[in-house]
């Protein structure tokens, strides 16, 4: 498995903010707005100072109107700036979420097959949904708080220094206390946040697994087991959140206590007139206290934003782990335009990542253009593994796989796979229409007539015509509205439409009734003519006419020959034939 990346908080946050860089103009405008908001903060205590020192004694009638109007104007301007800043940051946040999810999804499509073997669908879904939300909070919401409250604090501290720099420096002694508190709690919150993310991935995995296996759950009475697993997952998440809440909740009261001590010191020194200007007049004193109390809010916000940042950093580690994962090796430079269909396995061995034994051992065989070769043997013998090596779903451990005499590692993945059609016993359909499932991916440019011809050849047109909207009928999640045989025939129609020179059939007719199988076999016989076909078969009756049959056992080829030759040999294949009657 891919190990989590290890970066310092600063490097991790810098990388996270790099995704905000394309929107620097909007960020710049938002920062200007925050500067404007911060600049208005000291104005109110300054007005209070003037009001207390001069307002009640002043005889100027204009001040009776100017001061109230100034207060209203101040908060009106501030409100407009806050609105514009909030809207801009929300826009940036939505763009960041979209960009991150698109980048991650594109990465998912480029990951090698073994990555999907090691990570559940629920875990990957959680990364795209939950982790991205946490990262966005850290990169936008937390950024707003950091910039806005820092600027506000700077503006208020500047005003306090203007009123009485000595008293201000004394009260700023609480700064190291708050900084120490934040630093000491950050590591604990980061660890707790990582536990929360892991627990959320387990929740997503449990939900995804239960939904996809709902029929098995019902028929085998697994509701209690799945519910227990889900309860355990949610309990893990709750406990992780509570561990995160301990330091997060403690930071605010500690900040308040430190601030209250500072205010108490100010009050004592001002009232005792042991310092200068702040205690010189009632206006100065009230203005100083007001500014000091206003300073508590940004300080508190700066302290409480840390949990959001730590959650975002923990989530960004998970996201960057995915983004930094190795993609499929596609260093091949040669384009395979239209393959002849010649396939050669040259002393191929394969051991899956983390496996102790080899799945394939020294496999060698050659398929000439247009030949039909069948792979038979017990489950786990290596049949599906061989078929997975041709489109390079897995890299070989040793040896070579060649197509038209070219090592497939030297061929671009796209052009190699363009020459291969696959029909698996595990039919995959998409939540779309019948026609879109047949003309899927690169086939979507095919004409409607071509789609109909493929459906007819796969013995699927009769049932398609009976559907409410024919080819335009939605089929539900993975073809849930169709029968097993209908789903299988759509997959065959998709392969027929692709018209690739290399065809891989993994028990492609297993879900068909006798009559449908007869018709599909006839259609496949036409399709297989002058095409190289690799058939993985469990029922030997389906491969009697294969040009060559390879019998596999525990990752090795133990017999080779035609159906008749292998029966006459009276060995492994003949025993399989007798067992199937």
Swiss-Prot record:
Membrane-related topology note: Multi-pass membrane protein
State the PROSITE patterns in the record: ABC_TM1F, ABC_TRANSPORTER_1, ABC_TRANSPORTER_2, MSBA
- GO CC terms of this entry: plasma membrane
ABC transporter domain residues are: 343-579
Binding-site residues for ATP, renumbered to this chain? 377-384
Which controlled-vocabulary keywords does the entry list? ATP-binding, Cell inner membrane, Cell membrane, Lipid transport, Membrane, Nucleotide-binding, Translocase, Transmembrane, Transmembrane helix, Transport
What job does the chain carry out? Involved in lipopolysaccharide (LPS) biosynthesis. Translocates lipid A-core from the inner to the outer leaflet of the inner membrane. Transmembrane domains (TMD) form a pore in the inner membrane and the ATP-binding domain (NBD) is responsible for energy generation.
Instruction: Identify its protein family.
Output: Belongs to the ABC transporter superfamily. Lipid exporter (TC 3.A.1.106) family.
Per UniProt, subunit arrangement is: Homodimer.
What is this protein identified as?
Answer: ATP-dependent lipid A-core flippase
* Gene behind this protein: msbA
């Amino acid at each position: 498995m891919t190990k989590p990346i290890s970066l310092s908080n600063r490097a991790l946050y810098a990388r996270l903010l790099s995704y905000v860089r394309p929107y620097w103009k909007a960020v710049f405008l938002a920062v200007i707005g925050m500067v404007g908001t911060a600049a208005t903060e000291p104005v109110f205590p300054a007005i209070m100072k003037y009001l207390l020192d001069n307002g009640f004694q002043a005889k100027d009638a204009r001040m009776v109107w100017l001061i109230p109007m100034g207060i209203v104007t101040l908060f009106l301007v501030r409100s407009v700036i806050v609105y514009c800043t909030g809207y801009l940051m929300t826009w940036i946040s939505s763009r960041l979420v979209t960009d991150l999810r698109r980048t991650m999804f594109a990465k998912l499509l480029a990951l090698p097959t073994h990555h999907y073997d090691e990570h559940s669908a629920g875990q990957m879904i959680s990364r795209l949904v939950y982790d991205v939300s946490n990262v966005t909070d850290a990169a936008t919401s937390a950024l707003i708080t950091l910039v806005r409250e820092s600027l506000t604090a700077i503006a208020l501290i500047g005003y306090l220094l203007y009123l009485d720099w000595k008293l201000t420096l004394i009260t700023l002694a609480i700064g190291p206390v708050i900084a120490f508190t934040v630093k000491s709690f950050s590591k604990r919150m980061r660890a707790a946040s990582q536990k929360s993310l892991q627990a959320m991935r387990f929740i997503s995995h449990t939900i995804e697994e239960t939904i996809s296996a709902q029929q098995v759950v019902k028929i085998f009475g697994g509701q209690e087991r799945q519910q227990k697993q889900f309860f355990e997952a949610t309990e893990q998440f709750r406990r992780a959140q509570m561990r995160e809440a301990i330091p997060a909740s403690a930071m605010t009261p500690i900040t308040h206590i430190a601030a209250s001590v500072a205010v108490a010191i100010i009050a004592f020194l001002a009232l005792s007139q042991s310092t200068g200007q702040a205690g010189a007049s009632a206006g100065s004193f009230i203005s100083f206290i007001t500014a000091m109390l206003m300073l508590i809010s940004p300080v508190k916000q700066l302290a409480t934003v840390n949990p959001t940042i730590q959650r975002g950093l923990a989530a960004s580690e998970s996201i960057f782990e995915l983004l930094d994962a190795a993609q499929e090796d596609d260093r091949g430079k040669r384009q395979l335009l239209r393959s002849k269909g010649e396939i050669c396995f040259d002393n191929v061995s394969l051991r899956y990542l983390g496996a102790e034994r080899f799945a394939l051992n020294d496999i060698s065989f050659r398929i000439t253009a247009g030949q039909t070769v069948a792979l038979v043997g017990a489950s786990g013998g290596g049949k599906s593994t061989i078929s997975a090596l041709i489109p390079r779903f897995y890299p070989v451990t040793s040896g070579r796989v060649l197509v038209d005499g070219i090592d497939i590692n030297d061929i671009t993945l796209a052009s190699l796979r363009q020459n291969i059609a696959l029909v698996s016993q595990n039919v995959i359909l998409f939540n779309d229409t019948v026609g879109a499932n047949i003309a899927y991916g690169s086939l979507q440019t095919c004409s409607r007539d071509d789609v109909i011809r493929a459906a007819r050849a796969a013995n699927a047109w009769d049932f398609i015509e009976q559907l409410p909207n024919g080819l335009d009928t939605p089929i539900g999640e993975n073809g849930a509205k169709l029968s097993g045989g209908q789903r299988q025939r759509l997959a065959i129609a998709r392969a027929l439409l692709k018209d690739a020179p290399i065809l891989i059939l993994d028990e492609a007719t297993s879900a068909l009734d006798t009559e449908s199988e007869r018709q599909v076999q006839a259609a496949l016989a036409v399709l297989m003519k002058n095409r190289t076909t690799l058939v993985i078969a469990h029922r030997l009756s389906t491969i009697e006419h294969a040009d060559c049959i390879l019998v596999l056992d525990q990752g090795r080829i133990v017999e080779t020959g035609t159906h008749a030759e292998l029966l006459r040999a009276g060995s492994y294949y003949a025993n399989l034939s007798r067992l199937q009657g």
